Amino acid sequence: MSRKFCVGGNWKMNGDQKSIAEIAKTLSSAALDPNTEVVIGCPAIYLMYARNLLPCELGLAGQNAYKVAKGAFTGEISPAMLKDIGADWVILGHSERRAIFGESDALIAEKAEHALAEGLKVIACIGETLEEREAGKTNEVVARQMCAYAQKIKDWKNVVVAYEPVWAIGTGQTATPDQAQEVHAFLRQWLSDNISKEVSASLRIQYGGSVTAANAKELAKKPDIDGFLVGGASLKPEFVDIINARQ
């Protein structure tokens, strides 16, 4: 089954009106691969501003959302709010949410379940730390994280999984294409064994972790890498080259 390449740009806590306008101008004027789906993860306060400036064919993602529709949850936003201002995606389970804000596998899975029920598409993040990789626990960790999602997600058609080795995020260290492919192949097999062969064949698995224009083409050649979740490079003009990595 052919899976449409999908590239997400996660701006994290970066950007202001001026820089967002510049990024939008770059993306609007660039010849982007029509066979690649592009999603921009923008800080919540700028989502509406970005939606008005970005090309309409680009998806827009919140970087977080809570597990209920409304209520006394100071500082949180809901999937319904994201949809209301024009976002169609949300990034959940990012390693920074797990490590800095203490989000558990169970909470992240509940967030994903609610976001999907509210009609958002979800980029569901997983990945191991350097300590876990060096201990040979990569497969064990990503399987545990996938199990948590699988307990709550029954329909996977609006889910993209993003594998992000935590040790490669923002460090300049990147998993080699072979290292990345090895984990993606394991995830594909895990999906086949634990969900279904159909989901395994159709679900897109992105790679995230210091993706740049320099390494994107080699990573994109791997059979089980279906796109990227890009951090810092998505704020730069080279993001266009990453989007076009399959060309």
Curated annotation (Swiss-Prot):
One of its GO terms (cellular component) is M band. GO terms for molecular function: protein homodimerization activity; triose-phosphate isomerase activity. It comes from the Eukaryota. It holds the Pfam family TIM. Substrate binds at residues 10, 12. The active site is at 94 (electrophile), 164 (proton acceptor). It catalyses: D-glyceraldehyde 3-phosphate = dihydroxyacetone phosphate. Gene3D superfamilies: Aldolase class I. One of its GO terms (biological process) is canonical glycolysis. InterPro entries: Aldolase_TIM (IPR013785), TIM_sf (IPR035990), TrioseP_Isoase_bac/euk (IPR022896), Triosephosphate_isomerase (IPR000652), Triosephosphate_isomerase_AS (IPR020861). Pathway: Carbohydrate biosynthesis; gluconeogenesis; Carbohydrate degradation; glycolysis; D-glyceraldehyde 3-phosphate from glycerone phosphate: step 1/1. Keywords: Gluconeogenesis, Glycolysis, Isomerase. Its EC number is 5.3.1.1. HAMAP family: TIM_B. Homodimer. Belongs to the triosephosphate isomerase family. This is Triosephosphate isomerase. It comes from Drosophila melanogaster (Fruit fly).
